[in-house]
From Swiss-Prot:
Protein name, as recorded: Tol-Pal system protein TolB
This protein's GO CC annotations: periplasmic space
Record gene name: tolB
Keyword field: Cell cycle, Cell division, Periplasm, Signal
Species of origin: Shewanella sediminis (strain HAW-EB3)
InterPro entries: 6-blade_b-propeller_TolB-like, PD40, Tol-Pal_TolB, TolB_N
Family of this protein: Belongs to the TolB family.
Complexes and interactors: The Tol-Pal system is composed of five core proteins: the inner membrane proteins TolA, TolQ and TolR, the periplasmic protein TolB and the outer membrane protein Pal. They form a network linking the inner and outer membranes and the peptidoglycan layer.
Keyword Cell cycle: yes
Keyword Cell division set for record: yes
Signal peptide: 1-21
Domain of life: Bacteria
Function summary: Part of the Tol-Pal system, which plays a role in outer membrane invagination during cell division and is important for maintaining outer membrane integrity.
Amino acid sequence: MKTFGKWLVLGLVILSSPVRAALDIVITEGIDAARPIAVVPFVWQGQGPAPQQISDVVMSDLTRSGTFKTLDELSLPQRNISAISQFQAKDWANVGAEAVVMGAIKPYGEDKYLVSFDLVDLVKAQMQSGTGPQSKQEFLIDSRETVISSAQFRQYGHRISDIIYEKLTGIRGAFLTRIAYVVVKHGEKSPYQLMISDYDGHNEQMLLRSPEPLMSPSWSPDGRQLAYVSFENKKAEIFIQDIYTQSRSKITSFAGINGAPVFSPDGKKLALTLSKDGQPEIYVVDISTKALKRVTNHYAIDTEASWFPDGKSLIFTSERGGRPQIYKVTLASGKVQRMTFEGEWNLGGSILPDGRSMIFVNRTNGKYNIARMDLETRFMQVLTSTRLDESPSVAPNGTMVIYGTTYQGKQVLAAVSTDGRFKARLPTGQGEVKSPSWSPFL
């Protein structure tokens, strides 16, 4: 567990190499409370075996969301239907699910496939099944078809999941997002690797490899860039790197601490921690001009800034009250307000996208856990039950938090829903994983 005020350092070798999916989400709690949904395997309407099964991606996404649980395929009364025209409401009368999705995949030219799917309101169909003939279109929640290539199967599966999630919850799905994180493989010549992958660990890519530690990746609002800290020149420096072109620029290289960079909501600035004038303080730097604005001025340590969605205020961690707590500073006035009071320490805060709640690390009785606090009522809920949690990062739809923790003596990533009901672990094969950062909507 990193302690407050401890600073890591980095260096690098730039790489861009796709590797196998290293993260494998293991659900540990909360599936019993999820909403049941049926996913019928999409029907392959071509010759030979199907290139891929999109419905497997959809089932995994919905289950991993913590909101839904998919029914066992063998329990489905109709297992070979591809459209609502084949749907028989009477067959589904005793199925305990709120919706069913079905679809088809068929060849559509060289390396092209037409994918169609229908999302059916099963509750409505069951309620009206005994009232006489009904138009099946009344049960249809959504229906779409799209032409994709073989390389787009997983991506389009995530897209279908996003549509289903939003149609049934009213909340935008986050299955087409990515995560950045640091992998440490002890014993190797360059053990530190900055990685990005799809939210579920697939399509993993190594952006940086270094003999020195890496830390604090932060996504730009457009999802094209990462800010991070590097010690490649034997001192802390902050860089921004384009994840597609690999081009990068040095943003700060002051004496002492250059740490915890985070993009502003408009992508034009970074909030960061510098100690160039003595104690660690919060600054904001204009990315294009490199102009600096000092935000805090206190003899205690100020660090780990995070933006409010409107870009007008920051939260940050400070020891100015004697122990690490989270404070809010209004950028226009410089007014500082303490936000947290419960527990021994509170640190590493992030504001949820709706601006109403805050996720952070709470230490009580020596245990570090992820917690959520309502900014209006100040009610705090501890979301996790492990001991050494750190570095929480919130999904762009505000429903899930990914964070670092310790499992069986190794640093791993884990996830928890923002209501605390669903928990999952993202173990890896080799090395330790830490410093996760969830991308914006892509």
